[in-house]
C-alpha cells in the first residue's frame, strides 16, 4: 500500500505497458519522481500529443499524423505493383530495415481468431478487398506471423487474391542466420525443408 494515492495511481497506469508488472512499474515511478522529473514531464507531454494526434493511414492503416502515410504517398511505391500484408504497424519498420521491399503495405492490426470473436471485418479484410478490386497489384506478399492464427489469416487472404487473379506469396520461415540445426525446433526445421531452394552455379 502506497502512502500517496497519486503515486499508486501512476504505478497502476504504468502497468498498461506490455511486459511491465507491479515491481517494474514501481521502479519506473520511483525513478521518474526521484531522479528524472523533467524526463517524466517530457514523457507525459509526448504521450498526450501522440495519443491525440496519431491516427491511421486511410490506405494501409499504419500509424501516421497525416491522412496518408509517407510510404503510401511515394509515387515509386504506388507504381511498384507489390503489396505486403502484415499483422502490426511495428512489422513495417522491420521489413523496411531489410531494404528488400519497395512496395506498399496493408496492416491488419491483428489476425483471424474466431474463438476470440475476431473475424475478417475486425482485421480490415473488407478494406483489403476494396484495394484488391480497385488498385493494380502484380503480387501480394503475406508476411503474417508463423503461428496457427497467422497461417489461417494468410490462407484466407490468399483465397481473396486468387479471386482477383493476383499472384500471392508467403514469406519464408526457417533457420536464422548463424543458427545451428540442433537448437532449432522441429516446426521451424520442417518449414526450412519445405521452403528449400535450388543452388544455382
UniProtKB/Swiss-Prot annotation:
Pfam families: RecR_C, RecR_HhH, RecR_ZnF, Toprim_4. Gene3D superfamilies: 3.40.1360.10, 6.10.250.240, RecR Domain 1 (1.10.8.420). GO terms for molecular function: DNA binding; zinc ion binding. InterPro entries: DNA_Rcmb_RecR (IPR000093), Rcmb_RecR (IPR023627), Rcmb_RecR_Znf (IPR015967), TOPRIM_dom (IPR006171), TOPRIM_RecR (IPR034137). It comes from the Bacteria. Keywords: DNA damage, DNA recombination, DNA repair, Metal-binding, Zinc, Zinc-finger. A zinc finger (C4-type) spans 57-72. Residues 81-176 form the Toprim domain. GO terms for biological process: DNA recombination; DNA repair. Belongs to the RecR family. NCBIfam families: recR (TIGR00615). HAMAP family: RecR. May play a role in DNA repair. It seems to be involved in an RecBC-independent recombinational process of DNA repair. It may act with RecF and RecO. This is Recombination protein RecR. The lineage of its organism: Bacteria, Pseudomonadati, Pseudomonadota, Gammaproteobacteria, Pasteurellales.
Amino acid at each position: 500500500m502506497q502512502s500517496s494515492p497519486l503515486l499508486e495511481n501512476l504505478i497502476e497506469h504504468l502497468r498498461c505497458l506490455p511486459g511491465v508488472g507491479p515491481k517494474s512499474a514501481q521502479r519506473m515511478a520511483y525513478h521518474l519522481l526521484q531522479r528524472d522529473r523533467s524526463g517524466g514531464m517530457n514523457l507525459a507531454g509526448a504521450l498526450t500529443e501522440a495519443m491525440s494526434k496519431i491516427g491511421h493511414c486511410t490506405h494501409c492503416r499504419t500509424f501516421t499524423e497525416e491522412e496518408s502515410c509517407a510510404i503510401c504517398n511515394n509515387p515509386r511505391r504506388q507504381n511498384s505493383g507489390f503489396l505486403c500484408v502484415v499483422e502490426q504497424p511495428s512489422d513495417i519498420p522491420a521489413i523496411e530495415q531489410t531494404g528488400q521491399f519497395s512496395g506498399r503495405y496493408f496492416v491488419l492490426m491483428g489476425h483471424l481468431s474466431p474463438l476470440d470473436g475476431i473475424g475478417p471485418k475486425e482485421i480490415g479484410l473488407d478494406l483489403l478487398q476494396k484495394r484488391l478490386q480497385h488498385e493494380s497489384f502484380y503480387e501480394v506478399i503475406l508476411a503474417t506471423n508463423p503461428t496457427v492464427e497467422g497461417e489461417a489469416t494468410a490462407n484466407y487472404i490468399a483465397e481473396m487474391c486468387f479471386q482477383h487473379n493476383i499472384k500471392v506469396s508467403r514469406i519464408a520461415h526457417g533457420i536464422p542466420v548463424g543458427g545451428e540445426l540442433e537448437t532449432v525446433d522441429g516446426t521451424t526445421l520442417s518449414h526450412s525443408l519445405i521452403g528449400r531452394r535450388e543452388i544455382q552455379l
